[in-house]
């Protein structure tokens, strides 16, 4: 018997951000995040690669069903999971200097300002290293299905244009014990997507951060589309524990 628990749902709008967060227990959780600022590809601009064992962390680089950016997303999540403190030091802490009140980088009105960045840094510095996420074709197909169909519309959120949920999409391609989904709108690099979800501005439960740092998740899939009618792009990230492709 499947057990579903609906937890707190939050929808917060500001100039450049849209966040929604909810949880389901099968055991399951999923969350969304959007940020329009972006960086270059993590691989194209990774001057600190000497600090990471890229060959170990880049678990998706040789698969043939993900784009370069989609592979970058998995690499960045594995960096964050393998050494949370170092990830915070290199990629999250530097954002602190770019705040003026609640305005980030002279252009983005945030919900919480510098406080949420400090909160994220503190969390990451206390977090224990986690096992790496491995790519899964079925999870990626589920993510790509949602990103491609939603990208052709102005819709946001986890409900598919056909009414599907993250879990029905994942079940279409595989079996799992736990599963989750994150969505980012407007971002154009793997690192930008992952850092924004970890910071989780405006979401009291930090559900997006928890998905990335969930010790139960061992597999991940990514779907990225440049065609969203409102935000320009949409990136869907799926997660699962005890997952197997059908």
Predicted feature descriptions by range:
Residues 140-245:
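A well-ordered secondary-structure block
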Residues 1-10:
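Bacterial N-terminal signal peptides that target proteins for export
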Residues 30-71:
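N-terminal low-complexity, Pro/Thr/Ser-rich intrinsically disordered segments
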Residues 63-173, 209, 215, 219:
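Short, well-ordered surface patches within globular domains
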């Amino acid at each position: 018997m499947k057990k579903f628990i609906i937890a707190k749902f939050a929808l917060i709008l500001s100039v450049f951000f849209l966040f929604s967060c909810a949880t389901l227990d099968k055991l399951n959780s999923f969350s969304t995040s959007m940020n329009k600022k972006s960086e270059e590809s993590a691989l194209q601009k990774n001057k600190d690669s000497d600090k990471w064992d890229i060959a170990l962390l880049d678990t998706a680089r040789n698969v043939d069903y993900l784009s370069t950016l989609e592979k970058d997303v998995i690499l960045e999540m594995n960096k964050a999971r393998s050494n949370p403190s170092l990830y915070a030091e290199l990629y999250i802490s530097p954002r602190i200097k770019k705040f003026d009140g609640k305005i980030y980088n002279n252009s983005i009105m945030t919900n919480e300002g510098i406080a949420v960045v400090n909160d994220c840094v503190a969390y990451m510095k206390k977090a224990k290293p986690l096992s790496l996420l491995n790519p899964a074709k079925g999870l990626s197909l589920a993510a790509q299905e949602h990103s491609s169909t939603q990208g052709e519309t102005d819709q946001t959120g986890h409900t598919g244009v056909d009414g599907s949920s993250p879990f029905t999409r994942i079940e279409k391609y595989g079996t799992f014990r736990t599963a989750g989904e994150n969505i980012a709108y407007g971002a154009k690099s793997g690192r930008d997507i992952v850092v924004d979800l970890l910071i989780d501005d405006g979401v009291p439960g930090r559900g997006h951060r928890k998905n990335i740092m969930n010790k139960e998740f061992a597999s991940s899939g990514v779907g990225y589309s440049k065609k969203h009618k409102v935000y320009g792009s949409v990136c869907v990230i799926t997660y699962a524990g005890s997952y197997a492709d059908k």
